[in-house]
């Protein structure tokens, strides 16, 4: 198979981090755009990206791109795409996509046209008047932006933020990809004492442990392309072997605390499922009263937002109490994510730096104190 172009969509604000991550994986020609990152490679690169990418949402093959101002343009562009390189005659190929700022603005109509064109192309190539679609799934995705169409083939299936360890969560889940991003922003590599005082279901601590171990986040899950006839099974076997060979061994100091014992029980279950249960200490404690576990370290947390678990005023009071509690914790570098636009006011001090991110569709800032 020739070199392919791959696209890794990501949450807004994580593009640079994802680009750096893909470069560290030795993937080639990495290019960063808004909410997505491109790279080039073969199926081995695709498998590595799926297994090892912590902050991207999925890995897709760019099949073709073209301009379309009419449904006929869209039909002909898709029909000219060599889908048979990947999709066999019995393959199922559902279509998803979106359109923004384009003449072709009806997504259901665009889906129907893309599907019709794909059926026409594959029917002609395989000499079939009807395609059974009884085989494995080859998810087609399209993007139409300012009348420019990109057609993709999704290799991941379920979004990469679903690692396979978090089957239960409390009321305020932070995406695993966002948790990994926060740990990366804190530059945690396993040497510092790491503490999440609002650990909830344990996601930030678990992602920190996996980063400390250099453990590939996708080892405990499967991917759509694993079932494709065009991708040799040895590709996945080799990628998993190489990922395991890159793991570190060591002792790490990771603490997750929370005032809610039910959340802590879920966190412990999730940590065990992730294979890092022995690396994380979970402790029931009030973040506004708990003694600092050590004189210095990294504090990374996602305190309750007013939009969800607490009323807004209660959340604001919590931020104030937490800020007063940490007033003299000068040895701690703090990375706190919040959707409260006046967080610094309630916390009691201005951040040294802040970075706008989106947790799903919720606009947040990571406030950095060091």
Q: Residue spans of the language-model regions?
A:
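Conserved S-adenosyl-L-methionine
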Residues: 174-291, 307-308, 314
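A short, flexible beta-alpha/helix-coil linker loop
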Residues: 100-103, 159, 304-308
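C-terminal catalytic and target-recognition region of SAM-dependent MTase-like enzymes
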Residues: 286-289, 293-370
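Non-catalytic nucleic-acid substrate-recognition regions in nucleic-acid-modifying enzymes
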Residues: 2-136
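SAM-dependent Rossmann-like transferase core, predominantly class I methyltransferases
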Residues: 151-187
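Short beta-strand/turn micro-motifs composed of small residues
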Residues: 10, 258, 338
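C-terminal edge-of-domain segments
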Residues: 140-156, 367
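Residue-level signal for inorganic ion chemistry
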Residues: 22, 95, 142, 302, ...
């Amino acid at each position: 198979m020739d070199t392919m172009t791959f696209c890794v969509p990501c949450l807004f604000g994580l593009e640079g981090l994802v680009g750096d991550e893909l470069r560290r994986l030795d993937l080639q020609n990495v290019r960063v755009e808004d909410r997505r990152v491109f790279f080039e490679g073969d199926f081995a690169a695709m498998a590595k990206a799926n297994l090892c990418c912590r902050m991207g949402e999925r890995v897709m093959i760019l099949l073709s791109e073209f301009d379309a101002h009419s449904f006929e343009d869209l039909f002909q562009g898709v029909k000219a795409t060599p889908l048979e390189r990947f999709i066999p005659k019995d393959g199922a190929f559902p279509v998803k996509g979106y359109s923004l700022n384009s003449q072709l603005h009806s997504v259901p109509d665009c889906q129907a046209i893309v599907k019709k064109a794909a059926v026409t192309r594959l029917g002609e190539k395989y000499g079939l008047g009807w395609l059974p679609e009884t085989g494995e799934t080859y998810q087609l995705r399209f993007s139409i932006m300012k009348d420019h169409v990109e057609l993709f083939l999704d290799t991941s299936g379920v979004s990469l933020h679903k690692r396979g360890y978090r089957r239960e969560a409390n009321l305020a889940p932070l995406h695993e990809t966002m948790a990994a991003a926060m740990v990366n922003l804190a530059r945690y590599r396993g040497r510092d004492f790491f503490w999440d005082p609002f650990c909830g279901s344990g996601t930030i601590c678990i992602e920190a442990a996996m980063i400390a171990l250099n453990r590939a986040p996708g080892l405990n899950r499967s991917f759509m392309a694993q079932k494709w006839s065009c991708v040799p099974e040895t590709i996945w076997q080799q990628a998993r072997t190489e990922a395991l060979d890159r793991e570190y061994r060591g002792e790490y100091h990771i603490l997750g605390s929370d005032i809610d014992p039910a959340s802590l029980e879920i966190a412990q279950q999730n940590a065990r499922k992730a294979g890092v249960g022995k690396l994380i200490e979970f402790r029931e404690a009030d973040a506004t009263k708990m003694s600092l576990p050590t004189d210095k370290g990294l504090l990374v947390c996602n305190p309750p937002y007013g939009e969800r678990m607490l009323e807004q005023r209660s959340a604001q009071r919590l931020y104030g109490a937490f800020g007063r509690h940490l007033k003299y914790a000068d040895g701690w570098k703090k990375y706190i994510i919040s959707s409260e636009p006046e967080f610094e006011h309630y916390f009691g001090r201005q951040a040294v730096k802040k970075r706008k991110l989106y947790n799903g569709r919720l606009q947040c800032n990571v406030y950095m104190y060091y």
